[in-house]
């Protein structure tokens, strides 16, 4: 900044220049904490651009503007030192000399409680995410490990490991809704599940005619009061195949 006096009048012309100031203008230039950083400039420019925003955004950013005003001239302008600051000393948010520096405002009375609460919220958020195992434990469905894993049973290997939705052996079998299967129930359930893996119903379509035994068989599963399910075969067509055809043989 330079001054030029017009000797024909009392007017003084002020011309703003971007020449770097002398080094002795900043006595504490070696202390990096007194200089504004790029984050400080970005924050100030964001606050100054609130004038072009909608009224709803202005309301949300009013608190940020108040905070920005409280830190006015609390740091030295690094861009002014480099000769690249586009603002004058009165309009720049940062100090252009040591005389303009102001002490930063004291922290609010409850700043320690605020920091502690923020830290507690971050910890609770991290715990809520948790590792994969905890999430799987929380999100278990009622059908969790109520059936034997087909891949594990046929190949002896399952890529899901302990996170598999199905049981890897009778020892991991659970009842519907949770809880391990105990005693005879485990044996009966395991046998039934093995039958299901191989195919519970085996149906062969055949032509039923008088004098020819039907090969059609089906499986029926019954459950006893103690919880053990058993399987028995029923040859239904053999019993009813001649019900409607016997009278023809009698006539002949």
From Swiss-Prot:
Keywords, in A-Z order: DNA-binding, Metal-binding, Repeat, Zinc, Zinc-finger
Protein name: Zinc finger CCCH domain-containing protein 28
Biased composition (Basic and acidic residues): 1-21
Region of interest: Disordered: 1-31
A Pfam match: zf-CCCH
GO molecular function: DNA binding; DNA-binding transcription factor activity; mRNA binding; zinc ion binding
Zinc finger (C3H1-type): 71-99, 143-171
Domain of life where this protein originates: Eukaryota
UniProt xrefs under InterPro entries: ZFP36-like, Znf_CCCH, Znf_CCCH_sf
Record-level GO BP terms: regulation of DNA-templated transcription
């Amino acid at each position: 900044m330079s001054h030029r006096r017009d000797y024909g009048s009392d007017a003084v012309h002020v011309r703003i220049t971007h020449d770097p100031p002398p080094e002795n203008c900043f006595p504490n230039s070696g202390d990096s904490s007194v200089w504004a950083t790029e984050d400080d400039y970005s924050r100030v420019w964001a606050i100054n651009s609130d004038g072009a925003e909608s009224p709803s955004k202005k309301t949300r950013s009013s608190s940020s503007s108040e905070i920005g005003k409280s830190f006015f001239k609390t740091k030295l302008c690094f861009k002014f030192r480099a000769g690249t600051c586009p603002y004058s000393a009165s309009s720049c948010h940062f100090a252009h000399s040591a005389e303009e520096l102001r002490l930063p405002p004291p922290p609010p009375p409850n700043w320690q409680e605020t920091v502690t609460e923020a830290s507690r919220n971050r910890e609770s958020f991290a715990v809520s995410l948790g590792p994969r195992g905890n999430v799987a434990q929380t999100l278990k469905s009622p059908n969790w490990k109520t059936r034997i894993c087909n891949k594990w049973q046929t190949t002896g290997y399952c890529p899901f490991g302990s996170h598999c939705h199905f049981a890897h052996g009778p020892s991991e079998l659970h009842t519907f809704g949770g809880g391990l299967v105990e005693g005879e129930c485990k044996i009966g359930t395991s046998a039934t599940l093995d039958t299901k893996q191989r195919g519970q119903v085996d149906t062969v379509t055949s032509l039923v005619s008088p004098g020819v035994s039907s090969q059609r068989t089906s499986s029926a599963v019954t459950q006893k009061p103690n919880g053990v399910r058993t399987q028995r075969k029923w040859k239904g067509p053999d019993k009813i195949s001649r019900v409607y055809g016997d009278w023809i043989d009698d006539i002949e």
